[in-house]
């Protein structure tokens, strides 16, 4: 009995999606005029868009019927816990997905009329059987980002007013369950302005009109300085040479360990390393003198891809979009663990998965690698995949960070969007994954984003990913990107794949050691 739900909105035609109007305007740039109104957020909010939907987000069929009943809610410091009873009222056993949406007050900041904020799936229910699901909602994921300063500039805020929650099994099949009233505006998280566009003249608002966008006229590629790692060994021969195993045993710190590496070794380690065994996507690390292994990679996410003609078979899993359609995170986690087991069996340390960009348009050539048009579903599904992968001795690598929504001329296309859309839609899934599952690796995207290459963007990598989210894992580039290696290292990227460009690297030892330190920390993960 099928129990999946649509992770995307199926409109009547391609022209009905807001992204279609300007998708083919230019080979070299795409302007995200629709802003936060992506997928169902557009069709449920914008006037005259409602009737353009053929099948709504969250819709799914079953051979049985279910009664979904809201039972109550408990408010907690950081959110709410809902209890929902689901009863099989038909004649066939089946599973049902409960989806919780909320409607925020359309105050100074425009809001989508419906936003997914929690979901859960029942076990297989026999006819007449009932199950009570407990679903958590986090207030942080209800907040809107104020890039204009209408309430509090550069902050996630909850505007005063009524927040109405709906419980059901799709964005259009639900009932009002609970109203939370906020008597005054609340700053949920104060941040800094980052990744501001320079070339975006307008964006869509909730009433279907357009407004100006905050833009930036400052310098490109404004790189931070890295903290100096105290020189201990000067990269020279000493009476005592420390190995990676000594770091694992606590005999020396990782920071002191990397100071043994010469400038030439630092320039080498920040690039990809040769293939070995059945790997065909190269390795990371590989400084034999100090016991740093060559950590081999395997492409994904639909299974472990290895070098052909080696008579080694691996499982081909359903594509990411189908996995998201299960709305079943324990199942996704289980599948990922099995896939990671195959990686482990073939001496692969790093699985280049999951893919988790947003389905902004049906025309994106890699939508099959990505989960959904919705950032919350994307983030929670990816988190499950990462947890499953890292249950084994394998590092997950969520990708492509970020705004990779067009394959044609993907190396040079500039995704131009507001900071609000970037944070609420295109980064939110990655943020959830970092907070929920702590992936050991992360891959940047090919594209340019607001006039800076993703892999060279210090505001994105050092500012948001590492600074705001506290990410301490390894950041690698996508394969054969067109970024300059020296800029990538200065931006906070650790490894250029599949190989480095040492001639582009100068003698910024602090930046090189910072990258090497993250590579060493990854190697320690496998010790």
Predicted regions and their residues:
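Glycoside hydrolase catalytic-domain context in secreted enzymes
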Residues: 1-173, 193-527
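Short beta-strand elements
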Residues: 173-192
